[in-house]
Amino acid sequence: MTMYIAFILSTIFVIGFVGFSSKPSPIYGGLGLIVSGGVGCGIVLNFGGSFLGLMVFLIYLGGMLVVFGYTTAMATEMYPEVWVSNKTVFGAFVSGLMMEFCMVYYALKEEEVEIIFKFNGLGDWVIYDTGDSGFFSEEAMGIAALYSYGTWLVIVTGWSLLIGVVVIMEITRGN
């Protein structure tokens, strides 16, 4: 059941990026990125990374949502273009969705999928096994290493997010 949930979340993840890559309007492109980011955090949570999924959700969807808000405010249109307003964009979006659904149907129906590389059922989607982690989880050890050995990485990341928000605010403020 867990592998089916991961498979469905991966499909929604790809559909969100198909919606983003068809670029109808900055508002809908930001919506596609937000949906894909939330589903990506759900995938991380599904594989047991509760703290990492929460942090990515808070940082990506909290911090980058500010940037999306300012960029869409800068590029507002009276009549924003949607996916169905342009026949070429709509055709590319529908064909991408149909290819994704055909791939999902083929992978769920067949026991073995071999297109470019070979899958033996949904069990090959498992990335790692946490049975041998002992008393400490791998996630807790990674977080401890990030804040003890990677202090400068955390500081540089925080400053770059702050500078990004300040630059976007200065651009949208006007001349």
Swiss-Prot record:
It is a multi-pass membrane protein. GO terms for molecular function: NADH dehydrogenase (ubiquinone) activity. InterPro entries: ComplexI_Subunit6 (IPR050269), NADH_UbQ/plastoQ_OxRdtase_su6 (IPR001457), Nuo/plastoQ_OxRdtase_6_NuoJ (IPR042106). It catalyses: a ubiquinone + NADH + 5 H(+)(in) = a ubiquinol + NAD(+) + 4 H(+)(out). Its EC number is 7.1.1.2. It is found in: Mitochondrion inner membrane. This is NADH-ubiquinone oxidoreductase chain 6. It comes from Sus scrofa (Pig).
